[in-house]
Amino acid sequence: MSNGTDSKTASAPPARSGGGFGGGGSRGGDRGDRGDRGGDRGDRGGGLGGDDDKRGGGRGFGRKKVCRFCAEKNASVDFKDQATLKYFVTERGKIIPRRISGNCAKHQREVAVAIKRARGIALLPYNAVVG
């Protein structure tokens, strides 16, 4: 079954140029032709690996955040207590996440519900106070 071309001598299909979903555009070439574009990822250590010693270490502290509601047994989450709830809201009116506030999951959920209730009865603003 020979039709004039041998599979061993057949050339590669022609390269696509431009258009389509390939993202090639009219610039030509493929990603292998880019070379070093002078980015600073190498300077910052953009990889995911460890080896913090070559960059000067990680954080300067290792103190674990503790949930203040678990630490103080008499502290409770109350939607009417504006002073406590303002500690868990940013200046823009967003609820501070658990990894920053240090709350446990249970009390973070209670704080979020309390903030939403306080907003509903106008004790806390929904958004930032402009002025």
UniProtKB/Swiss-Prot annotation:
Residues 28-44 have a biased composition (Basic and acidic residues). Binds as a heterodimer with protein bS6 to the central domain of the 16S rRNA, where it helps stabilize the platform of the 30S subunit. The keyword 4Fe-4S does not apply. One of its GO terms (cellular component) is cytosolic small ribosomal subunit. The keyword Ribosomal protein applies. One of its GO terms (molecular function) is structural constituent of ribosome. HAMAP family: Ribosomal_bS18. It comes from Myxococcus xanthus (strain DK1622). Pfam families: Ribosomal_S18. This is Small ribosomal subunit protein bS18. Residues 17-27 have a biased composition (Gly residues). Part of the 30S ribosomal subunit. Forms a tight heterodimer with protein bS6. The gene is rpsR.
